Amino acid sequence: MLIDDTPTTFTSPRDSIDTGIATVHQTLAIVDELSVWRNFFLGQELTGRFGALRDTEMKQICAEQLREMGIDIPDVDVDAGNLSGGQRQVVAIARAVYFGARVLILDEPTAALGVKQSGVVLRFVAAARDRGIAVVLVTHNPHHAYLVGDHFTILKLGRQELDEPRENVTLDELTHQMAGGGELEALSHELGR
């Protein structure tokens, strides 16, 4: 793998994180019983003398970062369990961006979300992309991919089936390839349809 044109090998997940690669997994590392700001800083809390938490500063930073990315969570003191699925995803993504992600790998960020919540997440993905962060969006939804993507790669059983920039692929072609491509055509022929 090349990082800034330099061949790089990672020996642990920490190595990739230190390089600026962040992953937001489908099953979020969000603690429902903690506030939004506590989740935002979880494991990387700002502390003062004698280890005291700098609560006020962390709340302010969290609120500012969410606002800068176009996300409206009026009260960062609210427990994360009270947020919608889309808002929870956005908090996890904003956290990765704030802590220096240059490459953001998102694993099915809209999988269990409705249309409105998916829109919240996709707007945030577009904002991260527009800030110069490389985004790898893993999804089974061609419509979501096409809304925010500028390059598409489709893998089937670990093999690359498609690798094209957006200008070379229509939404219909992307949908067809993601749905099985040639296999669907063979099945259609076999079934006489």
Place the predicted regions along the sequence by residue:
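Glycine-rich phosphate-binding loops of nucleotide-dependent enzymes
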Residues: M1-R193
